[in-house]
Curated annotation (Swiss-Prot):
A GO CC term attached to the entry: intracellular membrane-bounded organelle
Keyword Ribonucleoprotein applies: no
Membrane topology summary: Single-pass membrane protein
Originating gene: cyp515B1
Keywords assigned: Heme, Iron, Membrane, Metal-binding, Monooxygenase, Oxidoreductase, Transmembrane, Transmembrane helix
UniProt-listed GO biological process terms: organic acid metabolic process; xenobiotic metabolic process
Name of the protein in its database record: Probable cytochrome P450 515B1
PANTHER family xrefs: CYTOCHROME P450 307A1-RELATED, HEME-BINDING MONOOXYGENASE FAMILY
Signal peptide boundaries: none
Source domain of life: Eukaryota
GO molecular function, one term: heme binding
Family membership: Belongs to the cytochrome P450 family.
Subcellular location: Membrane
Amino acid sequence: MATLLLVIIFMITFIIYKNFDSKRKNKYPPGPINLPFIGGLYKLKPGKQHLSLNELYQKYGKVFSMKFGSYDTVILNEPDVIVEAFHLNSTSFMDRILLPSFEVVGKNQNIGFTQTEYWKKIRGILNISLTKSKTRLLEGLFNQEYFRFDQFIKKQLKSKSDTMFIRPYLKRLSFNIIYSYLFSETIPYEDELIPSDILDFIHASEELLVVLSRMPSDYIKVLRPFESHKKLKEICDRMSKFIKPRVDKKVELLDQDNPKCFIDYLILQIRSDPSQTIKIDAIQYIVLDLLVGGTDSTSSALEWMILFLSNHESIQEKLYNEICKNTNTNTTATTTENDNESYFPKLIEKNNYPLFNACVKETLRRSPPVPLGLPHLCSEDTEIGGYLIPKGTQIISNIYSASNCDKVFTDPLEFNPLRFIENSPPQTVTFSTGPRVCPGKNLSEDELFSFGTKLFKTFKFSRPNKNQLYDEVAILGITLEPKPFITKVSLRS
């Protein structure tokens, strides 16, 4: 028995060595020792994967390798190699790794989890639909929804307290923008007034992100017989019960001569496409991507911005003064669609607010909403950063490390918006780069500008305990969120 055990240990050690040695000779990136079945996943601390990968980056450099279970994986950790891969060599890294959980969520018909040819078609249709609907709806929609949020917060200040956990309200604000943009509908801010099916969808979307971040059987194949995707399927079914009837109703009642929202334009584009690559059934999966991704990324960025500017009140005051300087401060904002347009900045005036734009960039750099990019598949042998990436390798962009790299950013853990006002601002890859850059990038940036300038002109945010800074260490799900904190909200005079 002991002899057999020694033979097994020797064979495993020999396989690991041969695997490592052959790849080293072929210019394969360095990395930690991979164990049978699990590869290098033992190096990743649950809930702190971004920090674990950052430690490996510090040890092995800007391009390193490890196995995710049975998948050969290369991690890209600095902006230059991420750009080199996804922008300069985009054709080699256009495809996705199609993990089992991705198929459960998107049925190979959504935006994020599809292969190149399907994705190109869906991206083209989305771009046309986004452009047509955006032109007609965007700024008015932002203003209308912000003022609903504004009145709710003011009501809370009068009737309850000037301290609050603001995260759920920011999520409602962000959700309402995407929901209204898609369906021309909104939801209330009070839990007790939200229809039960919508509230269940919101809860299910939060559960989805948690479950997707804890799916080891995606990579460790021996676990698949024991860890079914039952929970994930249940969550997706709950979300489908909310989305599908609304999409079906839009299809049934569509007025081709008077499209009113993004879904209307999307239906028209799909029907007019001669290739019929994208089916009407795909709309529910596209909507799921936009609702879940669009809600969490924007609300998380706003919450981080409140946290950082509460820890750096002098910057918040300078930001307030910049907004006041460029807008009319002799009038009071109203809460109707015909609000006083001179009181708040317009989207076309973005360039007049360099400090605000720098605060947004610094917030997204310091705490990127999605710290790890969705996995790509290398479709042909390609050299990146001086290393050979073999065909079939999984590629992951470590956006967290690339955004907090001391080679690119001086004092990267310090919140310093001024770094983006300098003559040669550093390069960022918050939304990744290349053809498969986040499709909601421009919409998210417009939301952050429109909401943020109004928010920080109307309210002052501060810490209830002046002697204690907010913790700037993040919690990782699929998105990077701050630890829950209570903020003090004061109405600006």
